[in-house]
């Protein structure tokens, strides 16, 4: 479903990704692990078509994703319907005047009818347990509440692939447990989950695979999640713990 071939990304002459090769199949739950500055966020932004490889190829469902293909508005809308992104900083994706409007914004761009929009929004608000916040301004919410709104706005699009950048940040322990169970349920329903994280305590049982980035912005290990997390010597050598 997702294939990166020798992908590198350079920003202002500084490498952020180096020669990345990875395949992710439909329905997998993959943790993206690495020390700060190793390229995890850049990797997710490439997957979402926010950044484009400086070299190499990114192929999604047999279509190469680059600046030219995403200039096609029809293809762009379809791509962003199929691949959703929850940013590390929720403020970066919350801009509407109410929570209800925030969750409705993306699906309204898809041309859905009012009744369908209303149903999807209400279903997602209920799923994230934020129905009581529907008339609130997103900027007045706590960090954990903002994260739930951001996730609801992505789920309203019903994407096949859900990518998340450090979703446990700014969430209290109860919220982290809720999010863990949500990710497990979403994956069981067939969603592909790709998540950058360092919060290992709260994500046990979510992922079946982990991809590890090094401080040199390269993938240095791709293995079962349990094998990597149990290898404390490896994690310490990589400056992850």
From Swiss-Prot:
This is Putative ABC transporter ATP-binding protein CA_C0773. Its main location: membrane. InterPro entries: AAA+_ATPase, ABC_transporter-like_ATP-bd, ABC_transporter-like_CS, ABC_transpr_CbiO/EcfA_su, ECF_ABC_transporter_ATP-bd, P-loop_NTPase. It is found in: Cell membrane. It is a peripheral membrane protein. Belongs to the ABC transporter superfamily. Probably part of an ABC transporter complex. Responsible for energy coupling to the transport system. The lineage of its organism: Bacteria, Bacillati, Bacillota, Clostridia, Eubacteriales. Residues 2-241 form the ABC transporter domain. ATP binds at residues 34-41. It comes from Clostridium acetobutylicum (strain ATCC 824 / DSM 792 / JCM 1419 / IAM 19013 / LMG 5710 / NBRC 13948 / NRRL B-527 / VKM B-1787 / 2291 / W). Its EC number is 7.-.-.-. One of its GO terms (molecular function) is ATP hydrolysis activity.
């Amino acid at each position: 479903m997702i294939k990166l071939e020798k992908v590198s990304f350079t920003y202002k002459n500084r490498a952020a990704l180096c020669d990345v090769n990875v395949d992710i199949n439909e329905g997998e739950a993959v943790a993206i692990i690495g020390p700060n500055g190793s390229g995890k966020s850049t990797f997710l932004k490439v997957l979402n078509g926010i950044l484009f490889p400086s070299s190499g190829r990114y192929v999604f469902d047999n279509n190469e994703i680059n600046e030219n293909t995403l200039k096609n508005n029809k293809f762009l809308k379809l791509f962003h319907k199929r691949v959703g992104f929850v940013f590390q900083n929720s403020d970066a994706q919350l801009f509407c005047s109410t929570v209800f409007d925030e969750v409705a914004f993306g699906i309204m761009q898809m041309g859905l009818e009012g009744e369908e929009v209303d149903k999807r929004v209400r279903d997602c608000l209920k799923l994230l347990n934020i129905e009581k916040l529907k008339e609130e301004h997103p900027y007045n919410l706590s960090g954990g509440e903002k994260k739930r709104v951001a996730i609801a706005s992505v789920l309203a699009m019903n994407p096949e692939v859900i990518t998340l950048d450090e979703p446990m940040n700014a969430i209290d322990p109860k919220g982290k447990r809720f999010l863990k169970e949500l990710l497990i349920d979403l994956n069981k329903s067939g969603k592909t989950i790709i998540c950058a994280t360092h919060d290992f305590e709260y994500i046990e049982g979510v992922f079946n695979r982990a991809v590890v980035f090094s401080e040199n912005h390269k993938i240095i290990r791709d293995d079962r999640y349990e094998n990597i997390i149990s290898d404390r010597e490896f994690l310490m050598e990589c400056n992850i713990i």
